[in-house]
């Protein structure tokens, strides 16, 4: 699907060294489509970043939920949860830039707030496991 291709390309562009601010013009050029074609799938660049954040949340919390269901030992849960987050960032350097907020500096502030909510939820899950 084109939406997934757009998000994958955006994430790949974020992996590039020195990728400060990614423009829709650069993204459309990389995909060899018009900017209008991007906007047929996403109303704004902020929505594209929201798509990446959705992917991050789904990926990380699906694994965390599996850890909580399978492991009764709180220390094991916390260790595995930390490992999940670190390995996700390592395997997805473009997404790690979104998670750290580096890729969101010049974007809509609600995206930074959304990543903060992700980490609040992550921290809450860690605390819950330690109770």
Annotate each PLM feature.
Residues 90-110:
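Amphipathic alpha-helical segments used for helix-helix packing
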Residues 64, 109-112:
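Short acidic, glycine/proline-rich loop/turn micro-motifs
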Residues 25, 36, 46:
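Residues within the helices of the helix-turn-helix
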Residues 16-20, 71, 92:
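Short coil/turn segments at alpha/beta junctions that flank glycine-rich nucleotide-binding fingerprints
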Residues 18, 43-44:
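A helix-boundary/kink motif common to multi-pass secondary transporters
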Residues 20-29:
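Ser/Thr-centered, proline-biased regulatory motifs
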Residues 32-42:
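Short hydrophobic/aromatic patch on the recognition helix
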Residues 4-12, 16, 29-30, 47-70, ...:
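Alpha-helical structural segments
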């Amino acid at each position: 699907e084109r939406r997934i291709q757009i998000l994958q390309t955006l994430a790949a562009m974020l992996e590039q060294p020195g990728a400060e601010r990614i423009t829709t013009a650069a993204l459309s050029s990389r995909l060899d489509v018009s900017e209008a074609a991007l906007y047929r799938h996403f109303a704004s660049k902020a929505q594209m970043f929201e798509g990446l954040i959705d992917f991050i949340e789904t990926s990380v919390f699906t694994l965390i939920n599996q850890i909580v269901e399978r492991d009764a030992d709180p220390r094991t849960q916390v260790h595995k949860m930390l490992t999940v987050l670190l390995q996700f960032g390592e395997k997805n350097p473009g997404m790690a830039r979104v998670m750290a907020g580096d890729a969101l500096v010049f974007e809509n502030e609600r995206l930074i707030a959304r990543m903060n909510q992700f980490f609040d939820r992550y921290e809450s899950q860690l605390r819950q496991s330690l109770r």
